[in-house]
Curated annotation (Swiss-Prot):
GO terms for cellular component: Asi complex; nuclear inner membrane; nuclear periphery. It is a multi-pass membrane protein. This is Probable ERAD-associated E3 ubiquitin-protein ligase ASI1. Glycans are attached at N24, N34, N46, N66. Keywords: Glycoprotein, Membrane, Metal-binding, Nucleus, Transferase, Transmembrane, Transmembrane helix, Zinc, Zinc-finger. The lineage of its organism: Eukaryota, Fungi, Dikarya, Ascomycota, Saccharomycotina. GO terms for molecular function: ubiquitin protein ligase activity; ubiquitin-protein transferase activity; zinc ion binding. Component of the Asi complex, which contains ASI1, ASI2 and ASI3. Interacts directly with ASI1. The chain crosses the membrane at residues 79-99, 127-147, 157-177, 182-202, 278-298.
Length: 676
């Protein structure tokens, strides 16, 4: 093959017959006549044939042999401006605006109500998109000569129809996904802009002189979108990755086979741009897998080595939270990094790609705790999957229509088995001799024999002295034993009614109040400055952090951050915040009020919060659960608990506390209420 390339290069340099070289190796379906002295068509740098009036300066440049980078840049700029004023660029711009409006439409509607699309509408829309893509697929296959009855001689009409079918499928997918609040299945390998540029180049070609690489690119774009709508139609989104793996493996096999048989004559620059990443990932995965198998064969226990690799793959899949709806290139890239790493490091999705449902997507800064992430409206995207009912709960297309055959099959099998059992039982009874059936003997109910006259014999113990033990058999059937060996019954001592549980509880409560009053009196008499309070709170917080980090069981890799400490030791963080708020409110004299103060009187305290439970309070207690002073005005999401004030929320947030103080669930955001 290298010898042939050298011969062509020598011929090119000797004769400068550039067009004969390109026309014979561009992979056209119909080759030009070799006797043509001045061909009417030429090729672009990506081996794609376009019409002469578009780039005639490039033809003159190649004929003169003055091929420089500057002249090539001028031709590229002229080609770009020619595409920019074409109808394909206008269609691409219009499609992008429509897709953007459909995406933003979900954020403009009210968050209080959930929109549910009926099953028939979703099925109808996906069916329309599927039929449109099938029509586009048949037109593309007709360009390869597979279906002559569908062949279109007008290349402009062919390119426009394919583009409109693909754009319609994208609009339907974006509309349904944005309406039902589910992630959209997009095909980023074949964008609308690249598709429009490719179709613009095809529209400038005469019929029968299209480059095979351009049509292969269209084939891949239609196939990938067809897989998306099929999995949506049958409600099997988790199998989207399987379909893309089959498509990429099929294209890879076809390209390798054609390259081996006919060389690289069918490849152009657009084909390399769209297919090369996927092919590179597949080649890397195959080579790495072969190396792993060969390494396992030369080990003492090959099955154990392969099993450990399988466990690594399983851990990699779980750690990245893959569900089968991702694109092939995303999964393949992560798998290549895993297979080619020497330290078996699990590359997570969060290392390179941020998930759209993370808390960081709602703000531009890194959120240490959800208590610092303010949300202005009801966050439906933070609610759990069980609470969200945006999608239709009706059965899918397959279960609705194809399930009818399963129902008919079940009914036929049930009645056939019943008829078979009836016929078999009749034949069996007629063929065997009739034998007398022995009925089961019913047990006698002894209670029927007990009457008003003889009940004493059953319920009373006869006098043993009057009975002859040897002759009278009734002595053996006595209901009660002769001697009672059980312990005697002693009634308990009477409880002193003067002492009750209520008085005991009231005594404990009064003692608690007295102790609290003493502590608060001591604190009020020794009030300190705010700076000293902050230093005390800081010392207490640092002491708890150092005490936690010095424990052998709490070692972490690297420095201990606030978020890590908040997740690992939430109880310690909560205690620190309670102490901090208690010191603040005690020093500011918020927790109590002095009433009727005189020189000879004792201190009388009136607490702002009740010591009793909420059931015993006449009105609802809206005091904060942490400081017990301020009113609750913070709602945490997605648990919807109203338990904190704004000051305690700030303290918990900056200390990395990530759970709710009421229900102990993860907090992803908060909203502030104005309670009157």
């Amino acid at each position: 093959m290298s010898t042939n390339i050298l011969q062509h290069v020598k011929q090119l340099l000797h004769n400068r017959d550039v067009f004969s070289f390109f026309h014979n190796k561009t992979g056209n379906l119909n080759y030009l006549d070799n006797t043509t002295q001045k061909p009417e068509v030429f090729v672009s740098p990506n081996s794609t044939i376009v019409s002469a009036p578009t780039l005639d300066s490039f033809q003159a440049l190649m004929e003169k042999g003055n091929f420089t980078t500057l002249q090539l840049a001028k031709v590229g700029i002229r080609m770009f401006f020619s595409y920019s004023v074409s109808k394909y660029a206008v269609l691409c711009f219009s499609t992008a605006i429509i897709l953007n409006r459909l995406t933003v439409m979900s954020s403009l509607r009210s968050n209080s109500t959930n929109i549910r699309l009926p099953l028939w509408s979703k099925t109808l829309l996906h069916l329309v998109a599927t039929l449109s893509l099938v029509k586009a697929l048949l037109q593309i296959l007709s360009q390869f000569g597979l279906m002559h009855e569908l062949h279109v001689s007008d290349t402009d009409f062919y390119a426009l129809s394919v583009y409109l079918f693909v754009a319609l499928s994208d609009c339907i997918e974006i509309f349904i996904s944005s309406t039902t609040n589910v992630p959209s299945l997009i095909c980023s390998d074949f964008s609308i802009w690249g598709l429009s540029l490719n179709l613009y180049i095809i529209s400038k070609m005469p019929a029968g002189q299209q480059h095979i690489g351009d049509n292969v690119e269209l084939l891949g774009a239609v196939f990938h979108r067809l897989v998306i709508h099929l999995v949506e139609l049958f409600h099997i989104r988790a199998y989207r990755l399987c379909g893309e793996v089959i498509l990429n493996a099929g294209f890879f096999t076809a390209f390798v086979t054609r390259t081996y048989l006919n060389g690289l004559d069918f490849i152009n620059i657009c084909l390399i741009h769209n297919y090369f990443p996927g092919f590179f990932y597949i080649s890397t995965i195959l080579l790495a897998s072969i190396g792993i198998f060969l390494k396992a064969l030369f080990t003492s226990n090959p099955f154990r080595s392969l099993y450990s690799r399988y466990k690594n793959l399983e851990k990699w899949w779980r750690s990245n939270n893959y569900n089968g709806e991702e694109e092939f290139n995303e999964i393949a890239l992560s798998l290549c990094l895993l297979l080619t790493s020497n330290d078996y490091k699990i590359f997570k999705k969060s290392d390179n790609v941020k998930s759209v449902d993370e808390v960081a997507a709602f703000s531009n800064s890194y959120v240490v705790s959800g208590h610092l992430n303010q949300l202005q409206s009801t966050p439906e995207d933070l609610l759990s999957r069980k609470e969200m009912t945006t999608d239709s709960q009706l059965p899918g297309f397959a279960r609705t229509y194809l399930g009818l055959f399963e129902l008919v099959r079940t009914i036929i099998l049930t009645y056939s088995r019943l008829l078979k059992n009836l016929l078999w039982s009749k034949n069996f009874e007629s063929s065997i001799d009739k034998k007398p059936r022995v009925g089961k003997r019913k047990k006698r109910d002894l209670n029927k024999y007990v009457t008003e006259k003889n009940y004493k014999k059953f319920l009373y113990k006869p006098d043993v002295k009057e009975l002859n033990i040897e002759s009278d058999l009734r002595s053996l059937e006595l209901l009660l034993p002769e001697d009672d060996s059980s312990k005697d019954y002693f009634p308990p001592r009477k409880i002193d009614e003067s002492v009750s549980d209520e008085e005991f509880d009231s005594d404990m409560e009064s003692q608690l109040i007295i102790d609290e009053e003493k502590e608060l009196t001591h604190l009020s008499s020794n009030a300190v400055d705010s700076d000293d309070l902050e230093e005390i709170a800081w010392n207490i917080s640092m002491w708890s952090i150092l005490n936690y980090e010095m424990d052998v069981h709490n070692k972490v890799n690297g420095p201990l951050t606030r978020s890590q400490y908040g997740k690992r030791n939430p109880q310690g963080v909560l205690v620190d915040v309670v102490i901090e708020r208690l010191l603040h409110h005690t020093n500011s004299r918020y927790m109590y009020k002095r009433l009727n103060m005189k020189d000879d009187d004792k201190l009388e305290f009136k607490f702002d919060f009740a010591f009793d439970s909420c059931d015993e309070v006449e009105e609802m207690d809206l005091s904060c659960l942490i400081c017990k002073v301020n009113k609750r005005n913070i709602v945490t999401w997605p648990c919807r608990c109203l338990a904190l004030c704004d000051d305690c929320r700030i303290s918990l947030g900056y200390k990395g506390f990530a759970t709710c103080v009421s229900c102990d669930s993860e907090v992803k955001g908060y909203s502030k209420l104005n309670i009157v």
